[in-house]
Amino acid sequence: MKKNILSLFMMLASGLGANAAADVDFEQNFCDSTLRIDYTFLGNATTQSIAVDKLNMMPRWYGKHAHLDELPVEGNGQITVRKHGTSEVIYRNSFSTLFQEWQSYDEAKNNVKSFENVFLVPMPRDTVDITVDLRNNRHEVVGSLTHTVAPKDVLIRHIGFGNTTPYVTLQQAKDTTKCIHIAYVAEGYQPGEMATFVEDAKIATEALFEHEPFSSMRDRFNIVAVESASVDSGTSEPSKGVWRNTVLGSHFDTFYSNRYLTTLNLKSLHDVLAGVPYEHIIVLVNTSEYGGGGILNSYNLSMTHHPQYRQVVVHEFGHSFAGLADEYAYEAEQIPMYPHDVEPWEKNITTLVDFHNKWENLIEPGTQVPTPMPEDKSEKGKVKSEKSSKVKREKRKGKSEKSEVGAYEGAGYSLKGVYRPYPDCRMRSNQHKDFCPACQKALRDLINFYTE
């Protein structure tokens, strides 16, 4: 008994020591404020350049305080902070960008464009070297910039210390020092429409927390709604000749895709948020037209007044928060985003190159890999109609979720060679009501990474 008590004491002491070390590491290297770095990414389909635009300091730091030199997901790019003149990493984070997506389109073959990007890191106490890397779909670094930041630089702008955009706290985390900070941002709402915006934000919040693992980990999230007013109501629709004056300049037809609703004005987005408690961003656009988008550690953007608003805002948060991939495929158009001889970094798709490090441990023994679709093996990997999906869900009601985890062909916009964990999922369709078991695990692991 004494031995057990001693062991328990040692475990507790060890845990306290680990937490204390993490706190000391942050305190030694960083202040409780945010360094916002504005970058310009420029290039075409085959070249890319990175340039620093502005340095800004904002009050408080709302990101991670532990695991500072670790990445929970690889992303399509990474930002790394090192002690000046050394190789010692004191902070890392990953991201994806619209610029990198644009490089995959035909327009990029004949044109050069620039894109705004904004990254947040904790404010260093001493001079640091910051490296931004861009990676291709083979995980190769194809663009890189290293620059030095001296925290005493008099040209670092101080923003967010006054005239903060009004915001409403929708949910306070149990421990605001170890939580995930989400900010909803109003886009296309006039001053008289702010009550509608706050209600739309509440709807999105309840939709998110209807899904596991968010529902059981709800108290780890701090959520605010930022009342950024626009001159005009709605959003721009270029293909219809409609242009509106909104705070973020959002629009449909991004990359000439009708339903792709985004904003390219990331500096304006972060200007609106200066002084607000935030790390993860959900932009709510005041429109009933279907559309949205989500970019890892950049933002999630969704329409609000379409019947499928709840499903879309949650789906896009899967992209922006956790880097989850789309699990659907197009029958009419194949988009070669994922080489079949390279394992994707996204946690919820695989090419089977390194399946052992994905969700293989969730599959029941004896399950065939690749896995035929339940009830209809001839249609594996194809996008089902809503009616077909509903019928199959009814037939499978008696089965456990784990019994259907496998490797189903058809994901990441490709019918062949890319596999998903489950017949259907929130990352695959608007009809399925849950994240699949593999997505749930990825989300749970990420929430723990940020909050434990």
Predicted regions and their residues:
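Bacterial Sec-dependent N-terminal signal peptides
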Residues: 1-24
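Beta-strand-enriched, solvent-exposed domains that form extended recognition/catalytic surfaces
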Residues: 29-154
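Fold-level signature of zinc-dependent metallopeptidase catalytic domains
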Residues: 155-212, 225-235
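Extracellular/periplasmic catalytic domains that process cell-envelope and extracellular macromolecules
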Residues: 174-178, 215-218, 273-278, 295, ...
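Short pre-active-site segment immediately N-terminal to the catalytic Zn-binding motif
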Residues: 196, 293-314
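Active-site-proximal segments of metallohydrolase catalytic domains
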Residues: 220-296
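Active-site recognition of the HExxH zinc-binding catalytic motif
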Residues: 310-327
